[in-house]
């Protein structure tokens, strides 16, 4: 589905931005604590955006199930792959 691909691309962008901001927060933690806090807050905000987009992916899949039954296996395989990749990246960002 085109919508899922668009959302997955946006989720990936949000993850990259969250990671970038977290790296900057760590870089400036000692020398510029207030700036580091801004970067930390931006990282958290990007994670929130990611969660909002993911919720929409889940809703699209649920709607498809209600209207058509189980989604095609290839579609779910791609979703499962991307979801696992995103969750792994999110865990890595949180562990910093």
Ranges and model annotations:
Residues 1-96:
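Non-heme di-metal
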């Amino acid at each position: 589905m085109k919508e899922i691909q668009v959302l997955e691309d946006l989720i990936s962008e949000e993850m990259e931005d969250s990671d970038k901001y977290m790296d900057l927060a760590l870089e400036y933690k000692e020398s510029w604590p207030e700036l580091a806090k801004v970067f930390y807050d931006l990282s958290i905000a990007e994670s929130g955006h990611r969660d909002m987009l993911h919720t929409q992916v889940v809703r699209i899949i649920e709607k498809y199930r209600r209207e058509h039954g189980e989604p095609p296996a290839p579609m779910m395989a791609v979703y499962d792959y991307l979801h696992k990749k995103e969750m792994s990246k999110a865990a890595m960002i949180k562990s910093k």
